């Protein structure tokens, strides 16, 4: 019985905490999402350039003796 009370108390506290959360407005959410998408795109381009560069360097090094 005490265990059931602890579980109930836990979920009651979770419910109380969700009322304290300050949820972002739609405008803030869109802005944050846009920042993440742009950051991922830029990071992907950096990875692409690095991968392409390393590939070309390795091809150059492997073809030196041929």
Swiss-Prot record:
GO-annotated molecular function: protein transmembrane transporter activity
PROSITE patterns assigned: SECE_SEC61G (PS01067)
GO BP term, example: intracellular protein transmembrane transport
Membrane topology per record: Single-pass membrane protein
Principal place of residence: membrane
InterPro entries named among the record's database cross-references: SecE_bac, SecE_sf, Translocase_SecE/Sec61-g
Cellular compartments annotated: Cell inner membrane
UniProt keyword terms in alphabetical order: Cell inner membrane, Cell membrane, Membrane, Protein transport, Translocation, Transmembrane, Transmembrane helix, Transport
Pfam families: SecE
Cysteine disulfide links: none
One GO cellular component term noted in the UniProt record for this chain: plasma membrane
Membrane-spanning parts: 29-49
Family: Belongs to the SecE/SEC61-gamma family.
HAMAP family tied to this protein: SecE
Subunit field text: Component of the Sec protein translocase complex. Heterotrimer consisting of SecY, SecE and SecG subunits. The heterotrimers can form oligomers, although 1 heterotrimer is thought to be able to translocate proteins. Interacts with the ribosome. Interacts with SecDF, and other proteins may be involved. Interacts with SecA.
NCBIfam families: secE_bact
Role according to the record: Essential subunit of the Sec protein translocation channel SecYEG. Clamps together the 2 halves of SecY. May contact the channel plug during translocation.
Protein name: Protein translocase subunit SecE
């Amino acid at each position: 019985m005490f265990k059931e009370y602890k579980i109930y108390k836990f979920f009651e506290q979770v419910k109380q905490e969700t009322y304290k959360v300050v949820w972002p407005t739609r405008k803030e959410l869109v802005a944050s999402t846009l920042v993440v998408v742009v950051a991922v795109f830029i990071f992907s381009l950096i990875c692409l350039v690095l991968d392409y560069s390393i590939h070309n360097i390795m091809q150059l090094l492997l073809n030196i003796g041929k």
